[in-house]
Amino acid sequence: MQIFVKTLTGKTITLEVEPSDTIENVKAKIQDKEGIPPDQQRLIFAGKQLEDGRTLSDYNIQKESTLHLVLRLRGGAKKRKKKNYSTPKKIKHKKKKVKLAVLRFYKVDENGKIHRLRRECTGEQCGAGVFMAVMEDRHYCGKCHSTMVFKDDDK
């Protein structure tokens, strides 16, 4: 029977084969006509790659069927070069965890009375729980940037 083999260039080769011929035999016939080694050939029929050990009848290849010949590609993707950094990586800032940090804001005297060590911000957007930083001559809120200046007798 006669089958056709279409190459990548669009050229069609005609081969005389039998249904009992193996795919290896077909590849050998293509090598005789085109000079392409069988290990570089891949034959495709009905969207499937044909395996060397099987016959044409296994794939239901009949007379005047068309096989597509593509070349086997060796290797994979291009190997990427490892990046080499010229400056060392910046160390990420780690927040220090202070156990019972609330104890820094209040003081308990011997009578059991609680005294606030820091002043809470009075700004509208701040509210309770936002303490102001103590400077030499003022209190400063880091959130709303309000400042309360001491008078000499206020300290």
Swiss-Prot record:
Residue span, Ubiquitin-like domain: 1-76
InterPro entries in alphabetical order: Ribosomal_eS31, Ribosomal_eS31_euk-type_sf, Ribosomal_zn-bd, Ubiquitin-like_dom, Ubiquitin-like_domsf, Ubiquitin_CS, Ubiquitin_dom, Ubiquitin_ubiquitin-like
GO biological process: translation
Cross-link (Glycyl lysine isopeptide (Gly-Lys) (interchain with K-? in acceptor proteins)): G76
Swiss-Prot/TrEMBL site (Interacts with activating enzyme) positions: R54, R72
Gene3D superfamilies cross-referenced by the UniProt entry: 6.20.50.150, Phosphatidylinositol 3-kinase Catalytic Subunit, Chain A, domain 1
Gene Ontology terms, MF aspect: structural constituent of ribosome; zinc ion binding
Keywords: Cytoplasm, Isopeptide bond, Metal-binding, Nucleus, Ribonucleoprotein, Ribosomal protein, Ubl conjugation, Zinc, Zinc-finger
SUPFAM superfamilies: Ubiquitin-like (SSF54236), Zn-binding ribosomal proteins (SSF57829)
Keyword Transcription applies: no
One Pfam family per UniProt: ubiquitin
Gene Ontology cellular component annotations, sorted alphabetically: cytoplasm; nucleus; ribonucleoprotein complex; ribosome
Positions marked as site (Essential for function): H68
Zinc finger (C4-type): 121-144
Family: In the N-terminal section; belongs to the ubiquitin family. In the C-terminal section; belongs to the eukaryotic ribosomal protein eS31 family.
Name of the protein this chain belongs to: Ubiquitin-ribosomal protein eS31 fusion protein
